[in-house]
C-alpha cells in the first residue's frame, strides 16, 4: 500500500519544469497564433450569402395557371403525405362539378421541409421556393393561409417556373 502511495505522489523534475514554464499554455497559444493569420472560412451571414442548391426547399407557394385559375384540385394528397401534419385543406364542389380548395393552410412551425407535398402534387400546385429569409415575431406569423401562399406564388412565378424547368430532367 505504501508503494502505491509513493508512486502516485512522485514528482519528477520534468513534470515540475512543464508546469512551472507553462509549456502546455505556450503550445496552445502557438496553435491559436498559427490560425489567427490564415484565410477565414466563417461567413458573416446577413452581409455575405452562400450559394443555395438548385434543389433547396424553402418557403411554400401555391401556383396558378396562365389564365389565373389556381392549380390546386383539392385532391388532398399533400395533406395525406405530410409527415408533420402541417397542411390543412378544406374543399367544396363547384357548379361545374370540379373541386377547389376553400381553405389551404400550412403551419411552418410544424413543417420539416421534406418536399413530400411538392412531390405528391399531380398538378404542380404546391411548390417550395428558393426563399430562405422569412420570419415571424409571433407564432401566428408562420401560419400561412391560402391567400398568403397564392401571393407568394404570384410574386415568384417566374423563378418557380425556371426552377421547375431546370429540374425537370431529374424527375
From Swiss-Prot:
It is found in: Cell inner membrane. One of its GO terms (biological process) is aerobic respiration. Coiled coil: none annotated. Pfam families: Fer4_7. Its cofactor is [4Fe-4S] cluster. It is a peripheral membrane protein. Residues 63-92, 102-131 form the 4Fe-4S ferredoxin-type domain. Binds 2 [4Fe-4S] clusters per subunit. Its EC number is 7.1.1.-. Keywords: 4Fe-4S, Cell inner membrane, Cell membrane, Iron, Iron-sulfur, Membrane, Metal-binding, NAD, Quinone, Repeat, Translocase, Ubiquinone. [4Fe-4S] cluster 2 binds at residues 82, 111, 114, 117. One of its GO terms (molecular function) is NADH:ubiquinone reductase (non-electrogenic) activity. The keyword Translocase applies. GO terms for cellular component: plasma membrane. It catalyses: a quinone + NADH + 5 H(+)(in) = a quinol + NAD(+) + 4 H(+)(out). [4Fe-4S] cluster 1 binds at residues 72, 75, 78, 121. NCBIfam families: NuoI (TIGR01971), PRK05888.1-4 (NF004538), PRK05888.1-5 (NF004539). NDH-1 is composed of 14 different subunits. Subunits NuoA, H, J, K, L, M, N constitute the membrane sector of the complex. PANTHER family: NADH DEHYDROGENASE [UBIQUINONE] IRON-SULFUR PROTEIN 8, MITOCHONDRIAL, NADH DEHYDROGENASE UBIQUINONE IRON-SULFUR PROTEIN 8, MITOCHONDRIAL. NDH-1 shuttles electrons from NADH, via FMN and iron-sulfur (Fe-S) centers, to quinones in the respiratory chain. The immediate electron acceptor for the enzyme in this species is believed to be ubiquinone. Couples the redox reaction to proton translocation (for every two electrons transferred, four hydrogen ions are translocated across the cytoplasmic membrane), and thus conserves the redox energy in a proton gradient. Belongs to the complex I 23 kDa subunit family. This is NADH-quinone oxidoreductase subunit I. The lineage of its organism: Bacteria, Pseudomonadati, Pseudomonadota, Betaproteobacteria, Burkholderiales. The gene is nuoI.
